[in-house]
């Protein structure tokens, strides 16, 4: 489904939180949305492999990487795994790499920056916890909508029709 965050903000201005404009689109899908699953991991993407193995239909993974742009948390392998398991998208408060490959995949991926250095894969981190970045607090189960203009968050799903 295609989302227009500007229209959604006009209609639901009282119900949505707007994430600060820190993110750029790196995936092949320019708009995406769904129920979020949160994860907090710093320069380590081992836990992301486990989470992206799950069925992602209607879901968006929100990754709090502490804002670090020294190591990329998402690479082509993880993005392909997410696509295979039908995730709608990934938002990374951190960096990605292999951006030409990411742009070819039909999945939404937004992040702060790109860097060629990969993350560790020790599996250090926590999932399904409250995370806060971009002026917004994210809880697993909230609903996120993203496009090239921005990212918005709602406690309940928005009536898009």
Curated annotation (Swiss-Prot):
NCBIfam families: NOT-MenG, PRK09372.1, RraA_entero
Quaternary assembly: Homotrimer. Binds to both RNA-binding sites in the C-terminal region of Rne and to RhlB.
Gene Ontology molecular function terms on file: endoribonuclease inhibitor activity; enzyme binding
Organism of this sequence: Yersinia pestis
SUPFAM superfamilies xrefs: RraA-like
Compartment(s): Cytoplasm
HAMAP family: RraA (MF_00471)
Entry annotated with the keyword Cytoplasm: yes
Family to which the UniProt record says this protein belongs: Belongs to the RraA family.
UniProtKB keywords: Cytoplasm
Swiss-Prot/TrEMBL GO biological process terms: negative regulation of RNA catabolic process
GO cellular component terms attached to this protein's record: cytosol
Name by which UniProt lists this protein: Regulator of ribonuclease activity A
Domain of life assignment: Bacteria
UniProt keyword annotation of Transferase present: no
Functional note: Globally modulates RNA abundance by binding to RNase E (Rne) and regulating its endonucleolytic activity. Can modulate Rne action in a substrate-dependent manner by altering the composition of the degradosome. Modulates RNA-binding and helicase activities of the degradosome.
InterPro entries: RraA, RraA/RraA-like, RraA/RraA-like_sf, RraA_gpbac
């Amino acid at each position: 489904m295609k989302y227009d965050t500007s229209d959604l903000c006009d209609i639901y201005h009282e119900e949505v939180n707007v994430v600060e404009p820190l993110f750029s689109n790196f995936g092949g899908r320019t708009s995406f949305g769904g129920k979020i699953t949160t994860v907090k991991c710093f320069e380590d993407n081992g836990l992301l492999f486990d989470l992206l193995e799950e069925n992602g239909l209607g879901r968006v993974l929100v990754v709090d990487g502490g804002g670090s742009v020294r190591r990329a948390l998402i690479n082509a392998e993880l993005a392909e795994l997410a696509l295979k398991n039908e995730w709608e998208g990934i938002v990374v408060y951190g960096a990605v790499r292999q951006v030409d490959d990411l742009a070819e995949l039909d999945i939404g991926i937004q992040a702060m920056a790109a860097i060629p250095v990969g993350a560790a894969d020790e599996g250090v981190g926590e999932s399904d916890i409250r995370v806060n970045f971009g002026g917004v607090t994210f809880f697993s189960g909230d609903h996120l909508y993203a496009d090239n203009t921005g990212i918005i968050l709602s406690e309940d799903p928005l009536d898009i029709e």
